[in-house]
């Protein structure tokens, strides 16, 4: 499982280290490959990063749906066609393709955030703004918090 948030730096070749706890989770999943794709929450762009096994489960779910559904087609055009498979190198880094890095507006400093079965890569400034906005929305919504049943 992927949880927590970590600040990392993208090097001049576009590589970024996968946080050590996330590398440990990948070892536990016996996954050596990752799939990166575009994502957006509200107006904040980032990259979703899936272990290959989780990505394959997502593709299986998508394949079981009506492939002619216009909404599903739009989603697949955005989410699946933009996906890029990569390996974690011997130093625990992944190469972020320039097209994906440009989409997410990634600067030199990024935040890598866990989201249970996958993780996200954000530009640090974008993540700080998004986190602050989400904190206000979540903590201010007592009805939602009360209904979580956790």
Language-model segments: residues:
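Flexible "stalk/tail and boundary" regions
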Residues: 1-7, 12-13, 22-86, 90-91, ...
């Amino acid at each position: 499982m992927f949880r927590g948030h970590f600040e990392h730096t993208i090097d001049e070749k576009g590589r970024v280290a996968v946080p050590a706890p996330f590398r440990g989770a990948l070892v536990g999943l016996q996954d050596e490959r990752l799939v990166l794709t575009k994502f957006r929450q509200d107006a904040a762009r980032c990259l979703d990063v899936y272990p290959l096994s989780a990505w394959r489960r997502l593709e299986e779910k998508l394949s079981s749906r009506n492939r002619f559904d216009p909404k599903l087609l739009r989603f697949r055009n955005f989410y699946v066609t933009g996906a890029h498979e990569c390996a974690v190198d011997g130093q625990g880094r992944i190469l972020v393709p320039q097209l994906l890095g440009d989409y997410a507006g990634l600067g030199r400093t990024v935040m890598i955030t866990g989201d249970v079965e996958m993780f996200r890569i954000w530009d640090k400034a974008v993540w700080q703004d998004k986190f602050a906005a989400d904190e206000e929305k979540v903590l201010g919504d007592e009805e939602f918090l009360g209904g979580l049943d956790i």
